[in-house]
Amino acid sequence: SDVLLDPDDVVRRHLLSMTPPLQSVCSTPYAFSLQIANSYLKNKDVIIDDDDDSGNIKIGDSILPLINFESGRFGGYQNIDAQGYQIMLNYRSYYNPNEFIERLTLTDFLESEVNMNLEDRIVLVGVTADSAGDFWDTPYNSGQADNRMPGVILQAHLISQLLSFGLDDRPLISALPDWSSSSMVWSTCLGWGLLFG
């Protein structure tokens, strides 16, 4: 479950698959999030397919908008690690992104103090304690160390993104083509020039 960091150490991209290094302990090319989503979606008769001749990954009938670095650029990205199949990460929008899922402590689980209605749900087991050291900067925390996202919550966002795309047609983030970015800059300059020139 590799995580891609942008130059400012913020997680904005979602790595779906890549060819593992020869000496890697983990030989699967697929991300943990993709494998969990695939297992869940199979029960909903939604298939994840990467055998498409174009090299795209499909969830059901929809193609994931993979980041295309062939031109060396993708939106604001230039000259970054472009290995594997990547999409932009569309976080769940909540006041506190660490609280978008139901969380149980191990004690609550063992003492059965909670309603154990786990049918048709994905359960991730992980550590959210500060001592775990598995925390990530996201666009939500803006460099504030005390608001970093635990790795297990980050995985929940990754899985949720794939499930919502496959089941609810939730749109994903993509970039405008290079030509449209240039057109927008020129249009803005022309507009400002006409208004204030």
Mark where each language-model region is.
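Flexible inter-domain connectors and hinge/loop segments
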Residues: 1-193
